[in-house]
Each structure stands twice: as structure tokens, then as C-alpha cells.
């Protein structure tokens, strides 16, 4: 079903969003179209959206209340994701899932209705209490129909690749002037070897660096604690004006448009 958007000022379209961490979104205040690999998934308000790590999406969303944030996001770091995966494998009696199988976008991005009581429990848990958060998420997943796809996606998201090691290295200091040579030295390998290993995973050094910089910039903008020039320096771009152009080219919106839409009240 297609959703008909109303006033343009209520909507935003953002391109090239790389999901670096397994993410669960709750569309508390928006209707969202998610585009990936020439497919579109429409998610209405008050739904959960499960986003597999590694997918690249574009989104178009419309707020219902302009002064509030459009959604609530739960992002799982590597340790949380592995613990969640291990627990689910035991609970549901699974040992291994084929990570090489051809999978459609509907198996990587899933939407579902959710019991508000369960969701409130998840939202109210202390963000630093990983065990309680994972336990609540497991319980929530157990109450969802057809949760096999979600469990499969969590398992696949937990698999680590060489490109993840490169990302982890760069993320330690995004302000550094990274080059392929620096990466090669860190892994005690040649630049050609690094390039080929990344190509085998359908990516490259420049793509990884740009995605990490833009993702970090977006998160820093949402924190509302830094000026544009500070954010630019924090992600390794010395010119604020150049950063604004790159951000706009990457996401299709300026940093100001991005911040204004997502900041909420």
C-alpha cells in the first residue's frame, strides 16, 4: 500500500544510510518509506522496524507532530548483538544459518506491530544495562509472529568480516587523515592485498571511510553539542564548507535540514 504524503514541510528524504549496527526502530511519530535495492517497504506509525547490519537504505518519512522526534532507535553494538544471537540460537534450538544464501530485502528489513507495554519496558531500561536490555528484546521477539526472519537477520548481522576490522580501526580515530597505506601497515599487509580483500566483500577503502564519516557526522548533529566546524574536524574534514557540501551530496539534505527535522521539541 502506498502512503500519500501531505505537506512537503513535514517530510524529508535521506539517501545513502548505511546501517552499521543492528537497529530496531519504533515509528512513534512518523510514516516511513524505506528504499533499498529497487524495493520499497512502507512502515506506518507505531510499528517496529528491524534493520539488518550492512544494508544501505534511503528513507522518506513524514512526521505526525512536527515538534517531536520522528522515531525511537535502539542500536546494538557488537557485544550486545553477539550475546543476543547466542541466546536466540539456544532458545530456538538453532545451530547455524547459511550466511551465503541469496536473500531478498524483505528478509533484511522487517516491520511488525508491537504491544506498547512491551515497547515501554524496552524504552525504560537503563541504556547501560545491556543484560536487561537483551533480555527484554528477547522477550519482545518471542511475542512476535513469524520471528524466524528476525532471528535469521540477527544471526547474519553478528557475522564479522574483514571490512568490519577496517571499520573498527578507522572508528577509533575518525579525525585522522586515513589512507589505504595506513590501513595496510596496521594489518601488516600490502595495499593490493587490502584492496582485494575489501573488493571481495563488495566494498572499498574510500567507500568505508566516507560512510563512517557521514554516519558519525549525523550522530553528532543529533547530539546538538557541537558546531559544524567542530563536527567537521572530528570526522577528519578540515573545511566546514567542504563538509557541508559532502554531507549534502551524500544524504541529499544539508546538515541544518537534517538537524532541524530530527531534533524534535
From Swiss-Prot:
InterPro entries per UniProt: Homeodomain-like_sf, HTH_AraC, HTH_AraC-typ_CS, Tscrpt_reg_AraC-type_HTH
Keyword Lipoprotein attached: yes
Disruption phenotype: No longer expresses CS1 or CS2.
Binding-site residues, decanoate: 20, 75
SUPFAM superfamilies reported in the protein's UniProt record: Homeodomain-like
Gene3D superfamilies per UniProt: Homeodomain-like
One CC-aspect GO term: cytoplasm
Protein's UniProt keywords contain Transcription: yes
Gene Ontology terms for molecular function: DNA-binding transcription factor activity; fatty acid binding; protein homodimerization activity; sequence-specific DNA binding
Domain HTH araC/xylS-type: 164-261
Location of the protein in the cell: Cytoplasm
Activity-regulation annotation: Rns-dependent expression of pilins and outer membrane proteins CexE-alpha and CexE-epsilon are inhibited in vivo by decanoic acid (decanoate); has no effect on expression of DnaK or flagellins. Decanoate relieves Rns-dependent repression of nlpA.
DNA-binding span(s): 181-202, 228-251
Main location: cytoplasm
Binding partners and assembly: Homodimer; each subunit binds one decanoate molecule.
Domain notes: Has been crystallized in an open and closed form; both bind decanoate which changes position between the 2 forms.
The protein, known as: DNA-binding dual transcriptional regulator Rns
Classification lineage: Bacteria, Pseudomonadati, Pseudomonadota, Gammaproteobacteria, Enterobacterales
